[in-house]
Amino acid sequence: MTKLVRLKIKFLVSLLVALFLSGCVESQPSPDLFALPVTYIVGKKPEVVIARDMNNDEFPDLLVVNSAGNSLNYLEGIGDGTFKTPQTIETGREPFALDVADFNGDGIPDVALCNYGDGNVSIILGQKDGLFKLKTDVKVGRLPIAVAAGDFNNDGKTDLAVTLRFNKLIILLGVGDGTFKLAEAYQAGPTPAYIPI
C-alpha cells in the first residue's frame, strides 16, 4: 500500500469517527414553525375575510362575509394569533364584499358591506366595546360586487366607491355622521370586480 493510499484511508476513518461522534452530541430541538391550526365556525359560504383592528386594542381582528348565510362574523383578536368566539351580525341578502373605515368621525372603525342580492350597501357602525350596530342601508343599484372607502372629494369625510356587476361605478359621498349621499354614477367596463384604492 502506498503512502498516499494510507493517508486517504486515515482521513476517511477520521472523518467517519467525527461524523459519528457529532451525531452523539445533544442538540436543541428544531423550532416549531407552525402551531396546530385552530378552526372557527363561521356562516355559510364565507366569501371574504379581512384583518383589521376593529376595537383599537392594537390586535388584528377578523371580519368574515358569509354570502349564503346573509351574515358577517366578527372575531376579536386576542393578540397571540387566536381569536374569541365569532359574533354574528345579520346583513342583507348575499353579502359579497366589504371595506373598513371611520365613517362617522368617532375614531372607531366602521364597516361598509355590499349586499349583492338587495342592491344596497349596509353601513355598520363600530362601537367602543367592539360591538356593532346596523346604521343604515344605502341603495346603489343592481348587484353591487365591490366597495372601497376613501376621501374622493378632499372634504375630510370618508366616501365610498361601489362597483355594480354590469358596468357601473357608483360614488357615495360621506356626510360625516355615518350616512352617505349619491354623488355620481359612471359607466365602467363590462363586469367590474374590484376597486383598489
Named regions from a protein language model:
Residues 12-22:
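Bacterial N-terminal signal peptides
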Residues 24-44, 76-93, 125-142, 173-190:
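Blade-edge motifs of beta-propeller repeat domains
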Residues 40-52, 59, 67:
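Beta-strand-rich domains and repeat architectures in extracellular enzymes and scaffolds
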Residues 47-56, 76, 96-105, 125, ...:
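Beta-propeller blade termini
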Residues 50, 62-66, 111-114, 160-163:
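Hydrophobic beta-strand segments that make up the repeating blades of beta-propeller
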Residues 58-60, 107-109, 156-158:
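Glycine-aliphatic tripeptides that mark coil-to-beta-strand junctions in extracellular
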Residues 71-74, 120-123, 168-172:
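A short loop-to-beta-strand structural motif that recurs across blades of beta-propeller domains
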